[in-house]
């Protein structure tokens, strides 16, 4: 029996509808419009595509949106200077620097330069530290892990007491979602095993899991025989495996062998249309929350 498809586009739309109401309340009650700046260095096609989607969504929600495109030759010092300018701009509540950056720029230094209270991507060390502490300490959740957790919650996937395997230990997805799923509350209280390329017995771990989250960056890495019947499978991978000359678009594959795994799993996310749309929705939610937060500063 084929798995139920977790439709990230539909869940994204319901979240954006909720945010439209919050944006309207901000405007009506406080005359405040959420402000988001997206900083793009160079013209990397994938980065340009991602930024365009983010800008489009922000405009649809009624944000004050600034697109700041910079040449690939910009220096690290100049880029940090631009960030500091937006740190001090009261009309800007969220600062997004699109990664990757050119090799001559230290990404860590750039991300550290963002005001933690405007770090709507949730990558600043201070916000990652708040995530570890949990509870009321949390300011902004990293967008992709937050999107994964929201998919689980809104798809009625029980995490309380669940055995979860996260494949991948990146600071962007694997580590944060592992922490979030072990915290107390809705979408948490799980028992999490984090595995990676150096782990032994990855297959055995996955076969015991109620939920498998694949964020390893290898096309079709997770096989059907790895999955316990009825388990939930979340595919974070977006891998370009070819190019469709008829449509002019890249051919994408996730980290999961979708065709075969979907015959075993109970629920599964597709690629595209699963986790990806949720990442942008969580960025928008963080920006709205930042606008509310700045009312008290």
Swiss-Prot record:
UniProt record, GO biological process: L-histidine biosynthetic process; methionine biosynthetic process; purine nucleotide biosynthetic process; tetrahydrofolate interconversion
GO MF terms held by the record: methenyltetrahydrofolate cyclohydrolase activity; methylenetetrahydrofolate dehydrogenase (NADP+) activity
Under catalytic activity, the entry for this protein gives: (6R)-5,10-methylene-5,6,7,8-tetrahydrofolate + NADP(+) = (6R)-5,10-methenyltetrahydrofolate + NADPH; (6R)-5,10-methenyltetrahydrofolate + H2O = (6R)-10-formyltetrahydrofolate + H(+)
Segments passing through the bilayer: none
Q: Does the keyword Lipoprotein apply?
A: no
Which pathway is this protein assigned to? Answer: One-carbon metabolism; tetrahydrofolate interconversion
Q: Which SUPFAM superfamilies match?
A: Aminoacid dehydrogenase-like, N-terminal domain, NAD(P)-binding Rossmann-fold domains
Q: Which GO terms describe its cellular component?
A: cytosol
Task: Report the Gene3D superfamilies cross-referenced here.
Answer: Leucine Dehydrogenase, chain A, domain 1, NAD(P)-binding Rossmann-like Domain
Q: Does the record's keyword annotation contain rRNA-binding? A: no
Quaternary structure (record): Homodimer.
Q: Function of this protein?
A: Catalyzes the oxidation of 5,10-methylenetetrahydrofolate to 5,10-methenyltetrahydrofolate and then the hydrolysis of 5,10-methenyltetrahydrofolate to 10-formyltetrahydrofolate.
Q: What is this protein called?
A: Bifunctional protein FolD
* Species of the source: Lawsonia intracellularis (strain PHE/MN1-00)
């Amino acid at each position: 029996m084929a798995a139920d498809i977790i439709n990230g586009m539909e869940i994204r739309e319901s979240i954006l509808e909720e945010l439209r109401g919050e944006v309207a309340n901000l405007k009506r009650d406080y005359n405040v419009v959420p402000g988001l700046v997206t900083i793009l260095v160079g013209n990397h096609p994938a980065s340009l595509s991602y930024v365009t989607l983010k800008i489009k969504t922000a405009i649809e929600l009624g944000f004050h949106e600034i697109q700041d495109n910079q040449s690939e030759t910009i220096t690290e010092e100049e880029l940090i200077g631009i960030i500091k300018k937006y740190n001090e701009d009261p009309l800007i509540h969220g600062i997004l620097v699109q990664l990757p950056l050119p090799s001559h720029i230290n990404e860590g230094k750039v991300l550290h330069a963002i005001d933690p209270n405007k770090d709507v991507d949730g990558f600043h060390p201070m916000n990652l530290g708040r995530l570890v502490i949990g509870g009321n300490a949390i300011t902004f959740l990293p967008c992709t892990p937050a999107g994964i957790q929201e998919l689980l919650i809104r798809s009625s996937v029980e995490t309380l007491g669940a055995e979860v395997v996260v494949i991948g230990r990146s600071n962007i997805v694997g580590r944060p979602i592992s922490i979030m799923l072990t915290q107390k509350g809705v979408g948490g209280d799980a028992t999490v095993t984090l595995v990676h390329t150096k782990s032994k017995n990855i297959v055995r771990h996955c076969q015991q899991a109620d939920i498998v989250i694949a964020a390893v960056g290898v096309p079709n890495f997770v096989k059907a025989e790895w999955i316990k019947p009825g388990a939930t499978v979340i595919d974070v991978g977006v891998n370009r495996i070819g190019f469709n000359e008829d449509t002019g678009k890249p051919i994408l594959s996730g980290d999961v062998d979708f065709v075969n795994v979907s015959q075993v799993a109970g629920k599964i996310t597709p690629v595209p249309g699963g986790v990806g749309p949720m990442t942008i929705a969580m960025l928008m939610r963080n920006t709205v929350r930042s606008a509310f937060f700045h009312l008290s500063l």
